[in-house]
Amino acid sequence: MGAPSALPLLLLLACSWAPGGANLSQDDSQPWTSDETVVAGGTVVLKCQVKDHEDSSLQWSNPAQQTLYFGEKRALRDNRIQLVSSTPHELSISISNVALADEGEYTCSIFTMPVRTAKSLVTVLGIPQKPIITGYKSSLREKETATLNCQSSGSKPAAQLAWRKGDQELHGDQTRIQEDPNGKTFTVSSSVSFQVTRDDDGANVVCSVNHESLKGADRSTSQRIEVLYTPTAMIRPEPAHPREGQKLLLHCEGRGNPVPQQYVWVKEGSEPPLKMTQESALIFPFLNKSDSGTYGCTATSNMGSYTAYFTLNVNDPSPVPSSSSTYHAIIGGIVAFIVFLLLILLIFLGHYLIRHKGTYLTHEAKGSDDAPDADTAIINAEGGQSGGDDKKEYFI
């Protein structure tokens, strides 16, 4: 019976000594800090806090155990290290222009009984240098293989390299990592190979560095490549639909790298060539029906030749309106406009006369000395007009 009764006592003792059980009684005099990451050349702030300072001051020391600040008092003469805040419950300092050598564990201490400490691990990121591309020597011929190398030094931790050509991602080999002589940073390198086409002529191959210290900023280098390829050509007529009697230019538009240096024009069924020149246009000063046929233009460079063909069909001359008919049309338009204006004037004149209606008798009668008789005569005259049967004439 003794063994079972001792089991609860053993469990209670185990719980009291467990690490979790220790958290049940929090030490208010224990300071706390946080780890920090900073880019080389930047500024880091170290913050130490304590709840119960027990009338003691906080202190910061560097990885070499050199005291930096004791309370608000500077202990190490380093202008990069400045006091940010000093209270009984907090001591914060800043380190500017951080170097790789500043990396390590910084200690915050409070001199209670016993002395309590907290650690802050400062990680310094090395910024990678701008990458360098090597391996490109001169122009490449179409379908040859281009091999480029890219290298960047000074990153910590080691950076990653990526390739692209224009908007297209290129898959280079795995990034190679080598430690720099300072023992802290790394040099990374990568290579890429691809077969070039004529579309790659003038393209930019870009090597970019990916690293957390850049915070999304672009750090890259580009290499423009030149590709030599055989020419192509096409024939463009001017005008597009030539007619008999017109002047015609057949433009032979050659493209290539290098551009064609010579153009040879031929017409099927005729010998020798019509034209051999460095100029690309074939000129017909005055087209005839006999000029119809198939023409070929051969564009030549030191990379090869290409022949384009064009079938010319000379259309009948278009009827040209005579100058006299054009003149007559203009005169007719002017006459029609004048007649239209006269009609408008006649309409307005008629409207005016209707609104101001009067007769000779009316005006003469009103101008006589015997006004009453004149009015009577006017009334009688109007009455005679309305009567229709009894028409009388009065002389005044």
Swiss-Prot record:
Under the heading CDD domains, the entry gives: IgV_1_Necl-1 (cd05882)
Q: Which InterPro entries match?
A: CD80_C2-set, Ig-like_dom, Ig-like_dom_sf, Ig-like_fold, Ig_sub, Ig_sub2, Ig_V-set, Neurexin-like
User: Where are the glycosylation sites?
Assistant: 288
Cell compartments where the protein resides: Cell membrane; Cell junction
Q: What Gene3D superfamilies does this protein's entry cite?
A: Immunoglobulins
**What ranges does the Extracellular topological domain annotation cover?**
23-328
Principal localisation: membrane
Its source organism is Rattus norvegicus
In the record's own words, the domains note is:
The cytoplasmic region mediates interaction with EPB41L1, DLG3, PALS2 and CASK.
Name-wise, this protein is Cell adhesion molecule 3
State whether it acts alone or in a complex, and with which partners, per the record.
Homodimer. Can form trans-heterodimers with NECTIN3. Interacts with EPB41L1, DLG3, PALS2 and CASK.
User: Which GO biological-process labels does this protein carry?
Assistant: heterophilic cell-cell adhesion via plasma membrane cell adhesion molecules; homophilic cell adhesion via plasma membrane adhesion molecules; protein localization; synaptic membrane adhesion
Q: Does the keyword Cell membrane apply?
A: yes
Residue ranges occupied by any Ig-like C2-type domain in the UniProt entry: 128-226, 231-313
**Cytoplasmic topological domain:** 350-396
**Topological type in the membrane:** Single-pass type I membrane protein
Q: Write one Gene Ontology MF term.
A: protein homodimerization activity
Q: Which gene encodes it?
A: Cadm3
Keywords from the UniProt entry: Calcium, Cell adhesion, Cell junction, Cell membrane, Disulfide bond, Glycoprotein, Immunoglobulin domain, Membrane, Phosphoprotein, Repeat, Signal, Transmembrane, Transmembrane helix
The UniProt transmembrane annotation reads 329-349
